[in-house]
From Swiss-Prot:
Tree of life domain: Bacteria
Any Pfam family the entry gives: Trm112p
Species per Swiss-Prot/TrEMBL record: Pseudomonas paraeruginosa (strain DSM 24068 / PA7) (Pseudomonas aeruginosa (strain PA7))
HAMAP family in alphabetical order: UPF0434
Protein name per UniProt: UPF0434 protein PSPA7_2181
Protein family according to the UniProt entry: Belongs to the UPF0434 family.
Any one GO cellular component localisation term in the record: cytosol
Length: 61
């Protein structure tokens, strides 16, 4: 994922920052507690496509 794109993307629910997951397959919104998938290099920024973070993921800094 292009770092410039990551700088301008925000969570569609909270408008907060997103963090690229360690395996680079998801964009994580800690505020919303959601992980948005990245498919074929394109972030899918739909709440209906996001998965809820588990407790450990929400607390992981």
């Amino acid at each position: 994922m292009d770092p410039k794109l990551l700088d301008i993307l925000a969570c569609p629910l909270t408008k907060g920052p997103l963090v690229l997951s360690e395996d680079k397959s998801e964009l994580i919104s800690k505020q919303a507690g959601l992980a948005y998938p990245i498919r074929d290099g394109i972030p899918v920024m739909l709440e209906s496509e996001a998965r809820a973070l588990n407790v450990d993921e929400r607390l992981d800094k």
